[in-house]
């Protein structure tokens, strides 16, 4: 039996991209970012996520963070939903970023579990409730214990949905494909369940998920959009064909600390320079060779 907390259709579905943030000589490269936004939309991406982990949000100033969100919203012109990153391990800071995103016209905010300070489940609940109050737009909970240490328990998600109508979904980077059916039963079909792991995107769909917030789609937006479209149209062979084609690319995107690999790939495709901010550094020659092989396998170069 499906849960009754979220009965309507999920608001956010399909192939979504956790956008990189391009730099040139240490400065935001706004023109390249605009090009990336249009490249994504023109190749079928269903939603864009600026200033998340892949967008190097921890090393952006608040002014830069807000600028990237504003440019993404303006350049996309309502063609696809914008889910703005608003994560911080400070509830006050996350609330400020979320409030700005809402006022700027974002469709939702993506809020990561607070990292480093290891809050209890009660602390997580209070954090997300406070940020949702500040955002005044839908909030996607970003559960990534590999980076944040503390996981968001299913019971905490249920409690959030019971007590705040703007808690609208999850970006699940746990790679636990048993979770979508659990949350369908506990919360309902209207709670957007988005994989945060490229390699498990298709299994996540098969388990009842609704889409993926992807790193690889910075590089292969069309292949990933086609995979999701094929799945949604019951063309499972085509979906699996694209999934197999992309596996080595998914692996290559994390051969070193992200977003180093994806930025190198973006430079190879002429999207922007590979420059990242410290402590992310230029990737090793062996990693570059591995990425080039993966790009060739996907017929991207």
Spans of model-derived segments:
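Catalytic alpha/beta core domains of metabolic enzymes, predominantly
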Residues: 133, 147-254
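A general structural signal for well-ordered alpha-helical segments in protein cores
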Residues: 33, 65, 69, 94, ...
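Short amphipathic alpha-helical/adjacent loop interface patches that line ligand
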Residues: 37, 69, 128, 164, ...
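Short helix-capping segments at alpha-helix termini
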Residues: 74-80, 104-105, 135-137, 162-166, ...
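Short secondary-structure transition/capping segments
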Residues: 60-63, 96, 121-124, 152-154, ...
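C-terminal alpha-helical cap/extension of soluble enzyme domains
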Residues: 3-5, 11-22, 39, 43-45, ...
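A generic secondary-structure micro-motif detector
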Residues: 26, 58, 87, 190-191, ...
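Active-site beta->alpha loop and helix N-cap motifs at the rims of alpha/beta catalytic domains
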Residues: 2-17, 21-24, 28-149, 159
């Amino acid at each position: 039996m499906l849960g009754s907390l979220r009965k309507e259709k999920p608001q956010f579905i399909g192939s979504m991209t956790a956008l990189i943030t391009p730099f040139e000589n240490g400065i935001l490269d706004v023109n390249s970012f605009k090009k990336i936004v249009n490249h994504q939309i023109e190749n079928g991406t269903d939603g864009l996520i600026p200033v998340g982990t892949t967008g190097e949000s921890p090393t952006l100033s608040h002014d830069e963070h807000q600028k990237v969100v504003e440019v993404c919203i303006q350049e996309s012109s309502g063609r696809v939903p914008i889910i703005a990153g608003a994560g911080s391990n400070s509830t006050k800071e996350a609330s400020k970023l979320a409030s700005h995103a809402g006022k700027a016209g974002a469709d939702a905010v993506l809020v990561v579990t607070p990292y480093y300070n290891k809050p209890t489940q009660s602390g997580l609940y209070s954090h997300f409730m406070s940020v949702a109050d500040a955002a005044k737009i839908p909030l996607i909970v970003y559960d990534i214990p590999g980076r944040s240490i503390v996981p968001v328990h299913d019971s905490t998600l249920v409690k959030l949905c019971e007590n705040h109508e703007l808690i609208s979904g999850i970006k699940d980077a746990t790679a636990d494909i048993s979770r979508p059916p659990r949350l369908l039963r506990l919360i309902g079909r209207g709670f957007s369940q988005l994989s945060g792991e490229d390699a498990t995107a298709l299994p996540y769909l098969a388990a009842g998920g609704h889409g993926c917030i992807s790193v690889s789609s910075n590089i292969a937006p069309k292949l990933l959009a086609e995979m999701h479209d094929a799945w949604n149209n019951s063309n499972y062979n085509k979906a699996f064909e694209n999934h197999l084609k992309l596996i080595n690319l998914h692996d290559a995107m994390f051969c070193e600390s992200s977003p180093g690999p994806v930025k190198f790939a973006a430079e190879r495709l002429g999207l922007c320079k590979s420059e990242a901010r410290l402590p992310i550094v230029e990737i090793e020659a062996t990693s570059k060779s591995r990425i080039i092989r993966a790009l060739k396998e996907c017929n991207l170069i």
